[in-house]
A protein has these predicted regions:
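Short beta-strand element of the alpha/beta-hydrolase
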Residues: 51-61
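Accessory cap/linker subdomain of secreted extracellular hydrolases
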Residues: 156-287
Length: 369
C-alpha cells in the first residue's frame, strides 16, 4: 500500500529532494547542493545567467520516504529554464508531509543564501506544483516586495481547511459509510497506519453500481483510480492530524448530497468534532488572503483526480474581496491527470507571466495549448 501511495506522489507532484551536501563546478553552469537549517537544497545557475531567479516549490512528500533528487520530469523542467538563462533554486524543506509552514521559511532562507553568494537578481519569481502551489501562493502573499510574480500550478488555492475537508476528509467519510470496514475511524489515526488499497478495490468490485455512483459524485474518471486516491488522502489526513495535534475536520454540520440515497447517508455517516488547536493550525497553513501586489498566473488541467478545478477558481473570490482581481489570472490545459502539463505548456505560461510583469499586458484567461 505504501508503495502505491508513494508512486502517486512521485508521478504527480514533482518531488525533488537531496540528502547530501556537495558542490560540483561545471564548465557551462554552476550547480550547488547542500543544507540550510536542515533543509536540503539545489541551486543551478547557467553560464550566461539573465539575472532572473526562479524559486521552485516541490509538492507533497510522504513522511518517511527517501529523498529523491533525480525526478525525470523535474529534471526536464529545470533544464528547460536553465537553457533559457534562468537560475533555478529548489529547497527540499526541513519537514515532510503537509510542510507548508516549514517550506515557506526554507524557501526564503534559500533565496537569501542565493543572493548572498550569487548576487541580487534583476527579477525573482516563485512557482510550484501541487502543494508547492500553496507554498508559492503563501510566499507571494507574505513577501510581495521580493518577487515580481508567481505561478502556482495545479494546487488547491482555496482555504486549505475547507478544501481538504471537502475533498479529502469527506471522501473518506462517505466511502467508509458506503463501503464499511475499508477506512475505519478518521480521528486519532494510529501513527504509520495506511489504507489497504486491496480491501478498497475488493469492496468496489463487489458493488459496481455503488462504485460508479461514488466516482461520479467525486468526479473521478475511473473506478481503478479510486483506491490509490483514497490511500493518498488517508495518508494526508493521518499526517496532518499528527503534525497539528488532533483532527482539524468537523462534519457535524455537513449535509451530504449527490449520492443515491442522501437521506440514508446523512443519517448513517460518522460525524466528527474538530480539535480547536488542530483546526487553527490548518487555518494558518494555509488560508489565502487575496492580498497580492504582484501578478499571479495559475494553470490547471481540465481533469485532476486529486485537486478539482474549482479549487483553483476559488482564489478569484479571495482576490475580488481584496480588490486585487486584476492581478490574478487562471488558465487551463486540456489534459488528464494531476499536474500533467508538458514542458512547452509550462514555458508558455511562464512567458505570459513575464510579459505581464514587463509589458503590463495582463494575459487572457483560457486555454494554453
Amino acid at each position: 500500500v505504501k508503495k502505491a501511495v508513494i508512486a502517486i506522489i512521485l508521478s504527480f507532484c514533482l518531488i525533488t529532494l537531496s540528502a547530501f551536501a556537495q558542490e560540483t563546478p561545471q564548465a557551462e553552469k554552476k550547480e550547488e547542493s547542500g543544507q540550510i537549517n536542515g533543509a536540503a537544497f539545489r541551486l543551478d545557475v547557467p553560464a550566461e545567467w539573465n539575472k532572473v531567479l526562479v524559486m521552485y516549490c516541490h509538492g507533497y512528500q510522504i513522511a518517511g520516504t527517501r529523498p529523491n533528487l533525480n525526478d525525470p520530469r523535474l529534471n526536464l523542467l529545470r533544464s528547460a529554464f536553465l537553457s533559457r538563462g534562468f537560475a533555478f533554486a529548489q529547497s527540499a524543506y526541513s519537514a515532510q508531509g503537509w510542510a507548508v509552514k516549514e517550506a515557506v521559511e526554507d524557501t526564503e532562507a534559500l533565496r537569501r543564501y542565493f543572493v548572498s553568494k550569487y548576487g541580487e537578481p534583476r527579477e525573482t519569481y516563485v512557482m510550484g506544483h501541487s502543494m508547492g502551489a500553496v507554498i508559492t501562493l503563501a510566499t507571494i502573499e507574505k513577501y510581495p516586495e521580493i518577487y515580481q510574480g508567481a505561478m502556482p500550478l495545479c494546487g488547491p488555492l482555496n482555504s486549505i481547511l475547507n478544501g481538504l475537508q471537502d475533498r479529502v476528509f469527506d471522501m473518506l467519510v462517505t466511502f467508509d459509510y458506503l463501503f464499511p470496514e475499508t477506512v475505519g475511524s478518521l480521528a486519532n489515526v494510529p501513527k504509520g497506519s495506511r489504507l489497504d488499497t486491496r480491501k478498497a478495490k475488493a469492496a468496489l468490485d463487489a458493488a459496481p453500481e455503488k462504485a460508479a455512483m461514488f466516482i461520479k459524485r467525486y468526479s473521478i474518471a475511473t473506478v481503478n483510480e479510486l483506491p490509490n486516491v483514497l490511500a493518498f488522502f488517508y495518508e494526508i489526513n493521518r499526517e496532518i492530524q499528527e503534525r497539528a495535534g488532533g483532527n482539524p475536520f468537523d462534519n457535524r454540520n455537513t449535509i451530504y448530497d449527490g449520492f443515491d440515497d442522501d437521506a440514508a447517508l446523512n443519517r448513517g455517516v460518522k460525524r466528527y468534532t474538530a480539535d480547536p488547536k488542530a483546526r487553527e493550525y490548518l487555518r494558518q497553513y494555509y488560508t489565502p488572503t487575496g492580498h497580492i501586489t504582484d501578478p499571479v498566473l495559475t494553470v490547471h488541467t481540465t481533469y485532476d483526480q486529486l485537486v478539482p478545478g474549482r479549487y483553483i477558481s476559488e482564489y478569484d473570490s479571495f482576490a475580488k474581496l481584496a480588490g486585487t482581481q486584476d492581478l490574478f489570472v487562471a488558465k487551463f490545459v486540456v489534459a488528464r491527470g494531476h499536474c500533467n502539463f508538458t514542458i512547452p505548456q509550462t514555458l508558455s505560461a511562464f512567458d505570459e507571466l513575464l510579459n505581464w510583469v514587463r509589458a503590463r499586458k495582463r494575459p487572457e484567461a483560457g486555454e494554453i495549448k
